[in-house]
């Protein structure tokens, strides 16, 4: 049985976790989201999010984006290599439906896997 949990070990939590990803990252970009990835020394992927107030004013909107990204990551974690990922939201993402955001994320996960394995 495959475990689809989202435990603490699957998250980037501290600034020290985020810094290496920002320093030299493999990007996957769309008009609404940017995913930055970097190989890690663990045997599983980890994710962190940067959802700026500048682009999504209300906490409800920022939390909706976080929930969607988290859920997608939970289901994709077994297809992803051992990488650290930072998801950055851009302006206009709050206007998209959940299905549109899911489609964008699907494409970006595939791009990241190609670029990190290739």
Curated annotation (Swiss-Prot):
Keywords annotated in UniProt: Endonuclease, Hydrolase, Nuclease, RNA-binding, tRNA processing
Catalytic activity reported: Endonucleolytic cleavage of RNA, removing 5'-extranucleotides from tRNA precursor
Domain of life: Bacteria
GO CC annotations, alphabetized: ribonuclease P complex
Subunit and partners: Consists of a catalytic RNA component (M1 or rnpB) and a protein subunit.
Molecular function GO labels: 3'-tRNA processing endoribonuclease activity; ribonuclease P activity; tRNA binding
KW Ion transport (keyword) present: no
Source species of the chain: Psychromonas ingrahamii (strain DSM 17664 / CCUG 51855 / 37)
InterPro entries (UniProt xref): Ribosomal_Su5_D2-typ_SF (IPR020568), Ribsml_uS5_D2-typ_fold_subgr (IPR014721), RNase_P (IPR000100), RNase_P_CS (IPR020539)
EC number assigned by the record: 3.1.26.5
SUPFAM superfamilies: Ribosomal protein S5 domain 2-like
Function: RNaseP catalyzes the removal of the 5'-leader sequence from pre-tRNA to produce the mature 5'-terminus. It can also cleave other RNA substrates such as 4.5S RNA. The protein component plays an auxiliary but essential role in vivo by binding to the 5'-leader sequence and broadening the substrate specificity of the ribozyme.
Family listed: Belongs to the RnpA family.
Enzyme class: hydrolase
Biological process (GO), any one: tRNA 5'-leader removal
Protein name according to UniProt: Ribonuclease P protein component
